[in-house]
Each structure stands twice: as structure tokens, then as C-alpha cells.
Amino acid sequence: NAGKQGQQIVYKSEKPLGAHITGAEPAKNWTKADGNVYVTRIPNSVFGTYNPYTTLVSGDWFIAYMTAHTGDIFLNGKSMYEVKTLDEVKAPKVYEASWDPDFTLYTWYTEQDDEKDETVIYANFQGKDPNKEDVEYTARRNCFYPSEEHVGFITLSGFKVSKAATQWAPPTAYQEGMIGPHWSKGWIIEDCEIFESKCSGISLGKYRQQNNDNKWLKWKYKDGTQTERDC
């Protein structure tokens, strides 16, 4: 429900940063596949209508050396590195351009088992036992985000908020975030620690416009000036 001007609805952690809103779930039941590589399976029913492990990050002006999924795998609170093939999980290589090159050896890969309707995750934990570590997978698209527009005058105060499978949010698209008002007004987001969103942590961006949603990517749209140049 929305608040009113001068009458905010307040969500506040009793202890500053003591409460944690997360879009992740524990990843359990790992079995050893090969060397340092383990595998686990997640029923697709867990994800409802949005499976982060079949959804690729995409949108206008998104350019990357590799197109990743919106889902992620976390080891002790830190996101591991998705790779394109199972072979890259079995024999990972250091990515020197990373802020933490050594951690780039902690890789994961996903595929679908259509017969069993399951998401299959392979991960290289570099000798660690994932059944004894804190391993999580992204299960939700957002953490604190109304499903409807115009839910105004909300305060979010003092929470840790992390690990959402957010989509790319260019100005030509529906701009979602891990936290966001979804085209509402009067929101206050304060004293929060926000981390490990796949894309946007906080989005104050626009609503969905069906005929103007990632139009450059979907329809190779060109504005008037570009059309003139082509002519």
C-alpha cells in the first residue's frame, strides 16, 4: 500500500544494517563432478515466470565481451564468474583485467535439463567444499520494488539489500532495479548498504512502454537524423 504526503509508510531495520533483504537462496545438494567442479540442480518451479538462468542481460547500448545471464552464483557473499562453456569451468583462466584476478578462477556455467525441467549449475570452487561454504543462487528479480506503479511515499531505512537478478536498464527501456519506486513519488531510501545486483542497485527510472522498450535492440530503430544520413 502507498503512504501519503506527510504520512510515509516506513520500513526500518531495528538495528542499523542488522536486517538483510536478499534476492538469493541457499544453493545446496552439491555433488562432485570432476576435480574442483561440483554440480547442483534447481527445480525451475522455484523461479516462477522469471528464470534468471534462461534470461540473458540485454538491452539498448549493452555491449560486453560475453553475454551473461541475469542470475548469479555467490560464494561467501561474493559473485563468482560466469563462463560460456563447461570446459571453462573445468580449466578456468585468470582474467587479469578484473579488480580481483585470483577470484576469476571461481567460475560457473549453467544449462537447462528440459526433460526434468531443472536448471543445472556447474561451479569450480578451487578446492573448497560448497556443502560446507555459504553458496547462494539468485532467485528473485528485485528485492524491494512494488509490482504496480504509483505506490508512493515509502521509506526504506537501514537495511542491507543484495543479490537480485536485475535486467539492464537503459533510458529507452523499463528501468528496474534491485530497489526502486517503479514510477512512484515521495520515496526515501536512506542508510542502506546495497550490493551485488546484477545490473542496477537503485533505479528511479521509467515505467514500461510497450512500443518504446529497447527499440534500438528489438527493431533496429533509427531516429530522424540517422535516417537522413542513410538517405
Language model features by range: what are they?
Residues 1-183, 188, 193-195, 201-203, ...:
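Extracellular polysaccharide-degrading/modifying enzymes targeting complex plant/algal/animal polysaccharides
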